[in-house]
Regions:
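Key DNA-contacting residues within the recognition helix of helix-turn-helix
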Residues: 8, 33-34, 62
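Short alpha-helical DNA-recognition segment
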Residues: 15-31
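Short, basic-rich loop-to-helix N-cap that marks the start of a DNA-contacting helix
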Residues: 38-51
Length: 68
């Protein structure tokens, strides 16, 4: 499960918003919002976000067991 709080934090740190990341992973903003809500992304989407957002420790965000 994705730690959406950490992901939102990184998006904000980069000066972006969720619409920017939706474009980055080639999805509509609506689809991205739904994926954030469910906390599920496929491997291609994860790789695009890791690269595009320059995420140093992706396991901390995308393979979180505790998302509190």
């Amino acid at each position: 499960m994705v730690n959406t709080n950490k992901l939102r934090g990184i998006i904000a740190e980069r000066g972006l918003d969720q619409k920017d990341v939706a474009e980055m992973i080639e999805k509509s903003p609506k689809t991205f919002y739904e994926k954030m809500k469910k906390g599920k992304f496929d491997s291609d989407e994860i790789m695009k976000m890791v690269s595009g957002l320059n995420i140093e420790n992706p396991a901390e965000i995308f393979f979180a067991t505790d998302v509190n």
